[in-house]
Curated annotation (Swiss-Prot):
Coiled coil: none
Protein name (database record): Single-stranded DNA-binding protein
Keywords, alphabetical: DNA-binding
Entry keyword annotation includes RNA-binding: no
InterPro entries named in the record: NA-bd_OB-fold (IPR012340), Primosome_PriB/ssb (IPR000424), ssDNA-bd (IPR011344)
Entry GO CC: nucleoid
Amino acid sequence: MLNKIVIVGRMTKDAQIYEKEDNKIATFCVATERNYKDDNNEISTDYLLCKAFGKTATNIEKYTSQGTLVGITGQMRSRKYEKEGQTHFVTELYVETIKFMSPKNKNNETPSDNQFENNTYQPDDLEIIHI
């Protein structure tokens, strides 16, 4: 089985950054367009919740803001939680790689590849299968 997602889209707002057990985590939403128009002749948009960890989260914090065009590869994950007696389901894109494709950061610069910090953190529940 394969769980590999590739998207290109724009960040809908600045990433939310927090730390858990000494690891930085970034959560953000990316808007992507579908390749067809709806009944009103308008292009439909999907909004994907994304989550990144470690150095990738640090780079997202440094080099992105609302409107940044990004290319992402990763895995879709679903989870559920209880809140006030109701079960909620969430589907998230766990970021493996991200490419910043437009200069939307505070300095209006796009970082070069050698400016990125290497990411070595993997979340505990991320299963890596080597073929």
